[in-house]
Design a protein with these regions (language model features):
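Aromatic- and Gly/Pro-enriched helix-to-coil junctions and flexible linker segments
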Residues: 12-73, 82-227
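Sec-dependent bacterial lipoprotein signal peptides
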Residues: 1-11
Length: 227
């Protein structure tokens, strides 16, 4: 009996032969940064820390960023388990369908296994480049620079949009407003067009319109820089 006990006892004592599947795999990306222009914080879309592969239109991983309490507050963000097919780490505006809207910052990723530690500095959310990408390029060029001509004599293609808007009189403004007057949202006809013009006011859903107007207002109040 004692021999049988030893036989079965040894047969059942396999020890711990399975790997611990709770251990993280992949690299970690740590990013330190701060934001200004918080008025332009996305409402419809999401500001996120992202990992992108070869396809730049859709991220492999995202970590949504929480809005800080004030401009300039230093944040430290982390993206865990960065996969080997990652080609860049980016701070970007992402749609709810997880499509890239606009990237504020990008850093290439090499093939090593070392952790990524990135110091980004300060990002201005109310940037003209984001307005160009998110608003003009996606919604306006068919009438203001595309094949059908220039509605309202306004050309907002990427290479001429800034010069077409800032401190330029809007021919359709009855009050004689500029399209954009730096620092003055009440004398910027671009906002009137998006808020009140029958052709344009329904271009976005409610939260999307709030996001676009806040973005443009924040940019104008910040001096309407070519940034």
């Amino acid at each position: 009996m004692y021999a049988l006990f030893l036989l079965f006892g040894l047969g059942c004592d396999e020890g711990k032969i399975y790997p611990d599947e709770t251990v993280d795999s992949g690299r970690t990306a740590t990013v330190s940064l701060s934001f200004t222009g918080l008025k332009a914080w996305p409402k419809e879309n999401m500001l996120s820390l992202c990992a992108f592969g070869e396809d730049k239109s859709k991220p492999l991983q995202t970590q949504r960023i929480s809005k800080p309490a004030e401009d300039g507050k230093r944040l430290k963000l982390r993206l865990n388990n960065v996969t080997p097919d990652t080609r860049s780490i980016e701070v970007a505006v992402i749609s709810r369908g997880l499509r890239l809207v606009y990237s504020y910052y990008t850093s290439p990723v090499d093939d090593s296994d070392e952790p990524l530690d990135l110091s980004v500095g300060e990002l201005d959310l109310a940037s003209f480049k984001r307005i160009q990408a998110q608003v003009f390029d996606l919604n306006c060029l068919s009438c203001h620079g595309g094949g059908s001509g220039l509605a309202g004599q306004l050309d907002i293609r990427d290479d001429v949009a800034y010069k077409s808007l800032v401190n330029v009189k809007a021919p359709l403004s009855e009050e004689g407003k500029n399209y954009v007057t730096p620092g003055n949202i009440n004398n910027s006809f671009l906002l009137d067009i998006l808020e009140n013009n029958p052709v344009h006011k329904d271009m976005f859903n409610s939260s999307g319109k709030q996001e676009v107007l806040a973005l443009i207002q924040g940019w104008i109040l910040g001096g309407a820089l070519d940034n």
